[in-house]
């Protein structure tokens, strides 16, 4: 394999860099988007219980905001700078937009690698084919020509190998983020029902 990489020359190096970067992004997002870090299972119940006990002082709300992405959204529903449920929902939507942006970190880059990798592989193959035919003289060995073409095609194959997991994981993470955001909105609405529909609510 090392010999093939050396034969492919400079066009293969962008693909190698892309593959390493894609792997790093996949690992980073897999860790960052773990459900327990985004949507702590008992957080909503704890917040509702604290609200009913009148324990959600500004300091507690600030601490909730730092708890997790869900905590940030729930905290926005408890801010005292809005007087109506509609105003609270606007705060929730604004917090949700910030959270969505943070959860989507690096996903665009991962998707771009998945899109560009096959093109880089094709570029390597084209460059290799040009070099092969330019070096051929009359009476050249057909076996050497066939081997040169075979080696050049490795570049396209490598590009596809890099692209497939990048595209699949990009789509998986995008779906995961979308699902998280829907669930955050649902939990925020359930909290607002408690805040605005019970005695003592705003």
Task: Locate the predicted segments by residue.
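Membrane-interfacial hairpin junctions
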Residues: 3, 134-147
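Residue-level signature of catalytic and energy-coupling elements of molecular machines
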Residues: 9, 23, 59, 74, ...
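Alpha-helical transmembrane segments of integral membrane proteins
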Residues: 12-25, 111-118, 124, 162-166
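Predominantly long cytosolic amphipathic alpha-helical stalk/bundle segments
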Residues: 37-120, 127-139, 168, 172-202
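Mid-bilayer segments of alpha-helical transmembrane spans in multi-pass integral membrane proteins
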Residues: 118-127, 152-160
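Pore-lining and gate-forming transmembrane alpha-helices of multi-pass membrane transport proteins
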Residues: 143, 147-170, 174
């Amino acid at each position: 394999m090392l010999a093939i990489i050396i034969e492919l020359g400079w066009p293969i190096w962008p693909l190698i860099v892309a593959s390493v970067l894609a792997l790093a992004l996949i690992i980073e997002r897999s860790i960052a988007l773990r459900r327990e870090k985004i949507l702590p299972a008992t957080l909503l119940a704890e917040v509702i219980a604290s609200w009913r006990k009148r324990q959600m002082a500004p300091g507690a709300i600030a601490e909730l905001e730092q708890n997790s992405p869900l905590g940030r959204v729930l905290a926005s529903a408890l801010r005292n700078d809005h007087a109506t449920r509609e105003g609270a929902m606007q705060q929730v939507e604004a917090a949700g937009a910030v959270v969505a942006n943070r959860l989507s970190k690096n996903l665009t880059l991962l998707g771009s690698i998945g899109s560009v990798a096959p093109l880089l592989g094709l570029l390597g193959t084209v460059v290799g084919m040009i070099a092969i035919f330019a070096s051929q003289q009359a009476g050249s060995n057909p076996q050497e020509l066939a081997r040169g073409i075979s080696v050049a095609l490795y570049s396209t194959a490598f590009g596809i190998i890099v692209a497939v997991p990048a595209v699949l994981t990009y789509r998986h993470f995008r779906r995961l983020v979308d699902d998280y955001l829907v669930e955050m909105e649902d939990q925020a609405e359930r909290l607002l029902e408690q805040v605005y529909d019970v005695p003592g609510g705003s």
